[in-house]
Amino acid sequence: MSKKMKNIAQSEVLTLREQISYQEGQVVSKTLTQNQAVSITLFSFAKGEEISTHESGGDAFVTCLDGIGKITIDGVEYLLHEGESIVMPAGHPHAVCLLYTSDAADDK
């Protein structure tokens, strides 16, 4: 059987937050799986960094793993706190921005 997930340990308990690091002034991404049915990607945002407004062909499920993020969907802003999730529907303009993280690198 071929491995469907990549860049992440299998058969091991893990914390998603520890699977990606913050880098000052950057949005960092790490793809875990991608195919015609689903794409799972971890993102880390330096404070104030964002993915600007765009639309996508599929729904996007976002979970905040650390800090507070601002999600904009159809011009409406939502604050997402650690542990909270939101679905950004396909075909609707949306953006993601980090407002605050508890990571010490955030204060550099």
Segments predicted by a language model, with ranges:
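Short beta-strand His + acidic residue motifs that chelate non-heme Fe in jelly-roll/DSBH
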Residues: 51-53, 71-72, 88, 94-99
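Conserved small/polar residues in nucleotide/adenosyl-binding loops
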Residues: 100-108
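A short, N-terminal "cap"/entry segment at the start of jelly-roll beta-barrel domains
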Residues: 1-37
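Short acidic-glycine-tyrosine-enriched beta hairpin
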Residues: 76-89
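Short, conserved beta-strand element in jelly-roll/cupin
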Residues: 44, 57-70
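A generic "binding-loop/recognition-motif" signal
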Residues: 38, 47, 57, 76, ...
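Conserved short histidine dyad/triad with adjacent acidic residue
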Residues: 26, 41-55
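Structural motif
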Residues: 68-70, 77, 93
